[in-house]
Amino acid sequence: MIDGIDSSGDGATELTVHRASEFTIEELVNAYNQTRIDYIVPMPMNARRLNEYVRNYDVRLDYSAVAMLDGQILGLSMLGVRPGRCWSTRLGVLPVKRRHGTGESLMRDNIRMARALGAEYVI
């Protein structure tokens, strides 16, 4: 079992984490909205708002994470970066893919990226 995904040779493949910068803003918006489809209070995003969010909160898409399995985006987590500190933001996993380690994989990746950036604090 790797990241909650059975990779024992029965046809299942391993979850992979990619940089968010590999995706278009539209792909990220779609993934973001799908991860929140079951929220009691809707928080829909569009391309303009996501671009503003990335700019206003110093999100580094080249250090942010997108989890995939068999070509499908399962979740994403963005990494905000300011001098000496980083924080995970906009973490979300598809409702039907939760509780299998995807969120943990995204958080571990954010922590690893923050350390690579020399962050003293990771929030």
List where the protein language model places each region.
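Terminal substrate-recognition subdomain of acyl/acetyltransferases
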Residues: 1-11
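Conserved acetyl-CoA binding element of GNAT-fold acetyltransferases
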Residues: 84-96
